[in-house]
Curated annotation (Swiss-Prot):
Residues 20-70, 497-547, 662-693 are annotated as: Disordered. Keywords: Coiled coil. The keyword tRNA processing does not apply. Belongs to the GOLGA6 family. GO terms for biological process: Golgi organization. The gene is GOLGA6D. The keyword Coiled coil applies. It comes from the Eukaryota. One of its GO terms (cellular component) is Golgi cis cisterna. Residues 674-693 have a biased composition (Polar residues). This is Golgin subfamily A member 6D.
């Protein structure tokens, strides 16, 4: 490698080096600004690098280069940047102070807002209190209006219920007729079904015989096919052994020919070597060769030709043997393919045989199942007949039970009426004594506190007596109502669910497809008179529930009167003790309101206890209006209410119990109603007067 000559730097290269140096200086300035510490000016290092890299660019005589001026500019820029940094720090501190002032102002504003919010909350609380008082006043007005509307709605509801009950009775009569017709049709169809079942049995027996014959034929054909298959397999095995022997012989011959060929090739190679040696000897300068040598050479040439001919013959034999081997391999392959095809055919035949056997088994199973189903259907028909007979017996027994229950209910009603008369007399006596006492108190408002306390004690004793009587009557009525409910629920369950009972066993899916038998209703119930007597039982339950509700009203109103008297006594005591104190008046008003709420709660609890046992009733006034107008006929234009779905046994019974074909005694109903009782009306009129005073 020759040394390269030194060339001067290009001016473009100089400019690039300067730009690189400027970029490095800027980086160093940034680092200086970040660290804020004085450092060595970047010009010295760059100057050294510049002098090392390009010594020719240095100026002579100690003159300043343009790089020095740039370094000075950079130093000036550093000083100016430090000044700007100081100014920025001062600005930041001033901004922080302003921020603190603003935060202080915000805190003061929040405090003022909180105070305003508290004042607003206090005002809202006062407004809420006023609204609550207003709501209480509205509720009192609403309850009074609601009571008036409630009585009107109940009267309309009763008229609709009566009409609906009549329609329901007609529907039940139609259902009874339909049940009787269905039973007759089923009796007719049962005989037809037995004939059809016998025909099916005969057909199935014939089909089974045909299938058995077909099975025997198929089994014989399968045996023949198996014998043919065995013979053919033996023949194939013999041919395969023959072909294997021939292949073994051909392979042995091929091996011998290959060995002979190798030997001949070895001899030919030796002869060729000897010929090459002789040719080399012949190529040498001619010498006086004896004639014996020439003769030897000729002999060798003849032998070589003879050997070549033999080799060619052996090659032809090898090719022919190879062709024969290929033909044999093709034949063996074809035979293998044929054998595989035959094996596949045999497998398919076996699969078909298995399928036919499975089909035959399935057909036999189907026939057996059909026989079982036919037998089961016959048994079911017999069981259905037995069930119908049992249901007839049950209905007769239930009729006897219902007649006995009617007698018991009449006896219980007579006892209840007697107790009601006694209670009404006691109520009248209590009301008269209370009226006399109230008249005396109103005439002499400045009586002594001892008289007021005695009256208060007497009122409490009366209340206790009334409560005890009420509890006794409630227990008796609840027991009677529970007994009636149980008896009538059992009756309705038997009528609504005729399929259930002692004979109601689990049926299969095939039985569900056949029409279910309807209960055989006795001939006594098909007549109009029998149905009316059958439907009078739920009506008697409705009468009993009306009596219970009347007694509840009779006890609730005197208890409300005693509560009003007690409240009036407390007001008089507070006025006598401190006549001109407004605070005690407010306390008295609060006590009165609390007592009213307690009485309302007690009334609601009594309603919740009594109503579920009596029936799903909506109010106490319904049965009062029904008792006053028991024989009102429904208007023809009144719309019938929609039929209810499968609600339950209690709902069905409630719909039936509203039918009142038997009119109760009008005098008894009016005596039990509080609207026609003069003593109760006087007490009700006096109670608001005492509250106003």
């Amino acid at each position: 490698m020759w040394p390269q000559p030194y060339l001067p730097p290009h001016p473009m290269m100089l400019e690039e080096s300067r730009q690189n140096k400027l970029a490095a200086a800027k980086k160093k300035l940034k680092e200086y600004q970040q660290r804020k510490s004085p450092g060595i000016p970047a010009g010295a290092k760059t100057k050294k690098k510049k002098t090392d890299s390009s010594p020719e660019t240095t100026t002579s005589g100690g003159g300043h280069s343009p790089g020095d001026s740039q370094y000075q500019e950079l130093a000036v820029a550093l000083e100016s940047s430090s000044v700007t940094i100081n100014q920025l720090n001062e600005n930041i501190e001033s901004l922080k102070q302003q921020k603190k002032q603003v935060e202080h102002q915000l805190e003061e504003a929040k405090k003022t807002n909180n105070e305003i919010h508290k004042a607003q909350m206090e005002q809202l609380e006062t407004i809420n209190i006023l609204t609550l008082e207003k709501a209480d006043l509205k509720t009192t007005l609403y309850h009074t209006k609601r009571a008036a509307r409630h009585f009107e709605e109940e009267s309309k509801d009763l008229a609709g219920r009566l009409q609906y009950s009549l329609q329901h009775i007609q529907e039940l009569e139609r259902a009874l007729c339909a049940v009787s017709t269905q039973q007759q049709e089923e009796d007719r169809s049962s005989s037809c079904r037995e004939a059809v079942l016998q025909r099916r049995l005969q057909q199935t027996i014939k089909e089974r015989a045909l299938l058995n014959a077909h099975v025997t034929q198929v089994t014989e054909s399968l045996k023949q096919v198996q014998l043919e298959r065995d013979e053919y397999a033996k023949h194939i095995k013999g041919e395969r052994a023959r072909w294997q022997e021939r292949m073994w012989k051909m392979s042995v011959e091929a091996r011998t020919l290959k060995e002979e060929k190798k030997r001949d090739i070895h001899r030919i190679q030796e002869l060729e070597r000897s010929l090459s040696e002789l040719k080399n000897q012949m190529a040498e300068p001619p010498s006086l060769a004896p004639p014996a040598v020439t003769s030897v050479v000729e002999q060798l040439q003849d032998e070589a030709k003879h050997l070549r001919q033999e080799v060619e013959g052996l090659e032809g034999k090898l090719q022919s043997q190879v062709e024969n081997n290929q033909a044999l391999s093709l034949l063996s392959k074809e035979q293998k393919q044929r054998l595989q095809e035959q094996e596949e055919m045999l497998r398919e035949q076996e699969a078909q045989r298995v399928r036919e056997q499975e089909r035959l088994c399935e057909q036999n199973e189907r026939l057996r199942e059909q026989q079982k189903t036919l037998q089961e259907q016959g048994e079911r028909l017999r069981k259905q007949e037995q069930r119908l007979r049992k249901q007839e017996e049950r209905l007769r027994k239930e009729e006897e039970r219902l007649q006995k229950q009617e007698k018991r209910l009449w006896d219980q009603e007579e006892r209840l009426w007697k107790k009601e008369e006694r209670l009404q007399k006691q109520e009248e006596r209590l009301a008269l004594s209370q009226n006399h006492k109230l008249d005396k108190q109103l005439a002499e408002p400045q009586c002594s506190f001892e008289d007021l306390n005695n009256e208060k004690k007497s009122a409490l004793q009366l209340e206790q007596q009334v409560k005890e009587l009420q509890e006794k009557l409630d227990e008796e009525h609840l027991e009677a109502a529970s007994q009636r409910n149980q008896q009538l629920e059992t009756q309705l369950s038997l009528v609504a669910l005729p399929g259930e009972g002692d004979g109601g066993q689990h049926l299969d899916s095939e039985e569900e497809e056949a029409p279910r038998p309807t209960p055989n209703i006795p001939e006594d119930l098909e007549s109009r008179e029998a149905t009316s007597s059958f439907m009078d039982l739920p009506k008697e339950k409705a009468d009993g529930t009306e009596q219970v509700e009347r007694r509840e009203l009779g006890f609730v109103q005197p208890s409300g009167v005693t509560d009003g008297m007690r409240e009036s006594f407390t007001v008089y005591e507070s006025q006598g003790a401190v006549p001109n104190t407004r605070h005690q008046e407010m306390e008295d008003v609060i006590r009165l309101a609390q007592k009213e709420e307690e009485m309302k709660v007690k009334l609601l609890e009594l309603q919740e206890l009594v109503l579920p046992l009596v029936g799903n009733h909506e109010g106490h006034g319904k049965f009062l209006i029904a008792a006053q107008n028991p024989a009102d006929e429904p208007t023809p234009g009144a719309p019938a209410p929609q039929e209810l779905g499968a609600a339950g046994e209690q709902d069905v019974f409630y719909e039936v119990s509203l039918d009142n074909n038997v009119e109760p005694a009008p005098g008894v109903a009016r005596e039990g109603s509080p609207h026609n009782n003069p003593t109760v009306q006087q007490i009700v009129q006096l109670s608001p007067v005492m509250q106003d005073t």
